[in-house]
Amino acid sequence: MGKEDVIRMEGTIIEALPNAMFRVELDNGHKVLAHVSXRMRKNFIRLVPGDRVIVELSVYDLTRGRIVYRKKPE
């Protein structure tokens, strides 16, 4: 997935699944299946349901994505 063919969207984690997979509800209402990026896994970033995250979606498959950033709680 190159940088020119990704869509970055914001969403909320609604469910934690096995193997570092998460179900994320995007701000537009769609639900996608997302995995944690390698950089977040390497730095031991913990994700729990309710966290606000930024997800990268491929233009070829809009049902799967990669979690690239966890927003700080406000």
UniProtKB/Swiss-Prot annotation:
It is found in: Cytoplasm. Its main location: cytoplasm. GO terms for cellular component: cytosol. InterPro entries: NA-bd_OB-fold, RNA-binding_domain_S1_IF1, S1_domain, TIF_IF1. It holds the Pfam family eIF-1a. Keywords: Cytoplasm, Initiation factor, Protein biosynthesis, RNA-binding, rRNA-binding. This is Translation initiation factor IF-1. It comes from Thermotoga maritima (strain ATCC 43589 / DSM 3109 / JCM 10099 / NBRC 100826 / MSB8). The lineage of its organism: Bacteria, Thermotogati, Thermotogota, Thermotogae, Thermotogales.
